[in-house]
Amino acid sequence: MAPSKWDDEEDSSSPPPPPVVARRKFDDEEEEDVLDSWDAAEDSEVEREKAAKAAAAAAKAEAEAAAKKKSKAQRIEEHKQERKKQAEANESDEDSDEDEAARRARLRRTEKEGDLKHAQDLFDDIDLNRNRGAPKAIVISDSADPTQAVDLSAMPLFKPTTKDQFTRLTTTLIPLLTAHSKKPHYALWAQEFTKQLVKELNSGDVKKIASALTTISNEKMREERAADKGNKKTKAAKTKVSLVASRDNKIDATPYDDDGLDDDDFM
């Protein structure tokens, strides 16, 4: 009997390959691999941080170098643009009912304040307050009662602008100051006071004031010389009168009894 077809197929089929047994990793070997991967990740993170810091430092250095190369006009323009953006940002937060005129006034005021602050930052060696002519507050307080104080700079008398106002200031101060002219330190004080008064004037105005003082000095010298001559004449006249008076009032004490004549000579 011929073998069945099924038997032939079974005989012709090859046996399956043996299973591949994977090598088992030890516990410590697996942990070492994990640690190595962590260390590598940490190293890469540190490198990235270092690279980011280096890039930031380089960008900052470039920005500083570029800023140094910019002129003052460019820096002022940049500040203006920044202030304009800030003002526009603040404008969005303001009340929507603000009218156009008020908004423009506020923007102009903000720009002026910013310009002044920036000018003070750039030219801090210039006394802007003095150039504006704003007087400093001069507060005089009572030593007995410190709460009683007066700001002289706020009084209209000390803020003259016209010729009449300056004349009024002069007529007010002169009597108060010249009342101390007989005191020992008045002359020295007047010299220093005059220097301080003309300190802010130009040389031409100072020369005119010096010429006026020279004229006053010459007039004083003539008055003093005339007074000295008058005193000398008066003194000489008094001396002459006293001599004549003393001569007239002299008593004649000559004895006339002993004249060498006897009474018999007349008989």
Curated annotation (Swiss-Prot):
Species this protein is from: Neosartorya fischeri (strain ATCC 1020 / DSM 3700 / CBS 544.65 / FGSC A1164 / JCM 1740 / NRRL 181 / WB 181) (Aspergillus fischerianus)
> Could you tell me what this protein is called?
Eukaryotic translation initiation factor 3 subunit J
Q: Which residues form a coiled coil?
A: 44-96
* Matching PANTHER family: EUKARYOTIC TRANSLATION INITIATION FACTOR 3 SUBUNIT J
Which Gene Ontology terms cover its molecular function?
translation initiation factor activity
Any idea which UniProt keywords this protein has?
A: Coiled coil, Cytoplasm, Initiation factor, Protein biosynthesis
Chain's role:
Component of the eukaryotic translation initiation factor 3 (eIF-3) complex, which is involved in protein synthesis of a specialized repertoire of mRNAs and, together with other initiation factors, stimulates binding of mRNA and methionyl-tRNAi to the 40S ribosome. The eIF-3 complex specifically targets and initiates translation of a subset of mRNAs involved in cell proliferation.
**What gene codes for this chain?**
hcr1
For this record, the Gene Ontology CC terms, alphabetical, are: eukaryotic 43S preinitiation complex; eukaryotic 48S preinitiation complex; eukaryotic translation initiation factor 3 complex
As for family, the record states:
Belongs to the eIF-3 subunit J family.
Question: Which Pfam families does this chain map to?
Answer: eIF3_subunit
Q: Where in the cell is it found?
A: Cytoplasm
Q: Where is the composition biased (Basic and acidic residues)?
A: 74-88, 108-121, 220-231
**Could you tell me where the Acidic residues compositional bias lies?**
28-46, 90-100
**GO terms, biological process:** formation of cytoplasmic translation initiation complex
Region of interest (Disordered), ranges: 1-128, 220-241
